[in-house]
C-alpha cells in the first residue's frame, strides 16, 4: 500500500498532478593516497598520465593488489551510514568497451558488495526530516578521462584517474522532490567529510551523482525511470530532476511512453538529452574477477574501525541542543561542516552557548559568506571571537561596540582586549557621566519629553540619542534605567 502523498510535493501537469520518484547513485572518490589496486598516486591536478602504473594501463601480466586503506574507508563509510557490513564480498568484472577503460572491463562489485542496507536521516528546510534508505555501497575502479579539446581532429586519454577507488552509494527511491534530493546529497557529503572517507569536492569530480527519475500519478505503480549521468553540483541535481520530471510528464500527458534510457543534463540549455539506451546487468556480463580472491575480514576488524569513528553530524547536533541549549535549526547550521562545528565548540567552551551560536552564525558566517571564504580561512580565530563575547559579558563593551570590535579584529587582527584598551572602546558605566548626557538630551527636547509619557515607545528614541552622544559607549541597561526614571515611564 502506498503512503499518503504530500500535496506540496506534487508537480502540476497540464491534465493531472504527478509525483516524482528519485533514487540516487553517488560515486564518492575514496580518500586514499594510492589507487584501489595499484600504488599509483591519486593526487589531483597532475600532468596527464603522470600517475599511471602498469596495472592502471592494463599491461599484460599485471595483477591487481587490493589497497587495504580503501577497504577500511569503505567500512567506515558503511558504519557512518548505519549499514550492514558484509564480512565477505566479491569483486566482479563489469565488461564494456570505452577508450578510457584500458582493461576492457571495470573491477566492481555486483552480487556481493562490501556494505549492505543502511539509512541517512535528512533534515529539510521546512523543519521536517525524512529517512532515506541505502540499498548498498560497493567499491569499484574509476575510469580514465577522454580529452576532446586538445586537438581539432584527435581525442586523447588521460589515465591519471584510471583505477582510483570509488564508493558507489546506492539509495532506495525514497526521494519525492528536487529539494529532498539536494538535501540528501548535502547530508551524505557532510557524513563523508566527517568520516574523512571522501573530500566531497564536486568541482574536482570527487563526488558525482547519477540521478534516477520517474513520475507517476499518486497511488499508481512506479513509472519507467531514466538515469541522468554524472551530475556534478548540488544545484544542477535539483535542476536536472525538475527538467526531467517535466519532460516525462509532457510525454505521458501527450499519450506517449517513457523509454528507459541514460540521459545527460545540459545546464546551459536547461534540458536533458538522450545518451544511450539504459543497460541492464546482463549487458555487462558480470562475473567474479579471477585475479582477486573474495574480500574477507572478521567482526573484530569492523569493531576496531567503529571505535575510531568521530562523532557524526546527527550525534553532534543532538549534543549541541542538549549541552548548549541551541535550537535544532541553529545546531543543524553549525554541524553542517565539521570545521564549523569544531570552531563553534571552541568558542562556546566555558561560555553561554546561545550567545556563542548567535555570534558564529550571524556575524561570522554572515561575513564569511559575504567575502566568499570558508571557515578554515576566517581571519577571526575562535579565541578572538570568544574574547569579544567575554568582553560583552563582563560589561566592558556593549553589543554595538562589539560589532565594531569584530570588524577591527577581522581586518587588522590583534587581541580584542588590547584593541579595546588602546582605542578607548570601553563602555561608560559611570552613572554620573551617563546621567549628564541624559539630562542634556531631555533639556534639549521638551516636546518629546511630554509625548513620551503618552507614547512610551519614544523611549527608544531617547536611548538612541544618548548612545549617540556617548559615542555608543554608554551601558545600555544603565541608559534605559535612567531614562525610564526621568521620563516617568513604567
Curated annotation (Swiss-Prot):
InterPro entries the UniProt entry points to: Asn/Gln-tRNA_amidoTrfase_suB/E (IPR017959), Asn/Gln-tRNA_Trfase_suB/E_cat (IPR006075), Asn/Gln_amidotransferase (IPR018027), Asn/Gln_tRNA_amidoTrase-B-like (IPR003789), GatB (IPR004413), GatB_C_1 (IPR042114), GatB_Yqey_C_2 (IPR023168), Gln-tRNA_amidoTrfase_suB_CS (IPR017958)
Ion transport as UniProt keyword: no
EC number(s) reported in the record: 6.3.5.-
Molecular-function annotations in GO: asparaginyl-tRNA synthase (glutamine-hydrolyzing) activity; ATP binding; glutaminyl-tRNA synthase (glutamine-hydrolyzing) activity
GO biological process, one term: translation
Catalytic activity: L-glutamyl-tRNA(Gln) + L-glutamine + ATP + H2O = L-glutaminyl-tRNA(Gln) + L-glutamate + ADP + phosphate + H(+); L-aspartyl-tRNA(Asn) + L-glutamine + ATP + H2O = L-asparaginyl-tRNA(Asn) + L-glutamate + ADP + phosphate + 2 H(+)
Listed SUPFAM superfamilies: GatB/YqeY motif (SSF89095), Glutamine synthetase/guanido kinase (SSF55931)
One Pfam family in the UniProt entry: GatB_N
Keywords, in A-Z order: ATP-binding, Ligase, Nucleotide-binding, Protein biosynthesis
Subunit structure, interactors included: Heterotrimer of A, B and C subunits.
Entry similarity comment: Belongs to the GatB/GatE family. GatB subfamily.
Function according to Swiss-Prot or TrEMBL: Allows the formation of correctly charged Asn-tRNA(Asn) or Gln-tRNA(Gln) through the transamidation of misacylated Asp-tRNA(Asn) or Glu-tRNA(Gln) in organisms which lack either or both of asparaginyl-tRNA or glutaminyl-tRNA synthetases. The reaction takes place in the presence of glutamine and ATP through an activated phospho-Asp-tRNA(Asn) or phospho-Glu-tRNA(Gln).
Protein name in UniProt: Aspartyl/glutamyl-tRNA(Asn/Gln) amidotransferase subunit B
Chain's gene name: gatB
